[in-house]
UniProtKB/Swiss-Prot annotation:
HAMAP family: Hypx_phosphoribosyltr. GO terms for molecular function: guanine phosphoribosyltransferase activity; hypoxanthine phosphoribosyltransferase activity. This is Hypoxanthine/guanine phosphoribosyltransferase. The gene is hpt. Belongs to the purine/pyrimidine phosphoribosyltransferase family. Archaeal HPRT subfamily. It catalyses: IMP + diphosphate = hypoxanthine + 5-phospho-alpha-D-ribose 1-diphosphate; GMP + diphosphate = guanine + 5-phospho-alpha-D-ribose 1-diphosphate. One of its GO terms (biological process) is IMP salvage. It comes from Ferroglobus placidus (strain DSM 10642 / AEDII12DO). The keyword ATP-binding does not apply. Its main location: cytoplasm.
Length: 187
């Protein structure tokens, strides 16, 4: 079911950013090119495991957008994109976000109190962006019914689960300088 996604992850090139092994994949980086079959597999997997009885799909700029858009088209639920720049709308939610390798602000528009949402993203690593987004959505009065990431690496998802968040993933990986190892995946 996730054959192309898994194979593409196993073949993903690794670059070193200092001492940090970083995998390059079309779904997480947009390069080299994003195979529509991989997006279809991801969306099919999300549909199988997600609670889609929601008002809106929330995704995080930039690489959550392709999967969330395809999901939106498949299930006819609108998307809210958490952006990296402000638009200055009156009810804009500003999110302070920090990951293992960057920090900055994120901006959420289009969320109303009582909205039931699912958060969909490409990858969760440290969990910093996910946690900041989840807390901001809760503060805005949204009801987060589910969080699904295509790829889980590192310990961020597990930390969030221990905090009581329901985090689901399609593929769990470990990354080393030698490559990507598939630890677990949706069957």
């Amino acid at each position: 079911m996730l054959n192309k996604l898994i194979e593409s992850l196993k073949n993903a090139p690794i670059i070193m950013k200092g001492d940090y092994p970083y995998f390059i994949h079309p779904l997480t980086d947009g390069v080299p090119e994003l195979d529509p079959d991989i997006v279809r597999e991801a969306v099919s997997g999300i549909i199988r495991i997600a609670d889609l009885d929601v008002d809106k799909i929330v995704t995080i700029e930039a690489m959550g957008i392709p999967v969330a858009t395809a999901l939106s088209l498949a299930v006819n639920i609108p998307i809210v994109v958490v952006r990296k720049r402000s638009y200055g709308f009156p009810n804009e939610i500003v999110v302070d976000q920090q990951t293992g390798y960057s920090k900055g602000k994120l901006y959420i528009n289009g969320i109303d109190k009582g909205d039931e949402v699912i958060v969909v993203d490409d990858v969760i690593s440290t969990g910093g962006t996910a946690l900041a987004t989840l807390k901001a959505l809760e503060k805005a009065g949204a009801i987060v019914k589910d969080f699904v990431t295509v790829i889980e690496k590192g310990d961020g998802a597990e930390k969030l689960r221990k905090m009581g968040y329901k985090i689901k993933s399609l593929v769990k990986i470990e990354v080393s300088k030698d490559g990507v190892k598939i630890v677990d995946h949706l069957r």
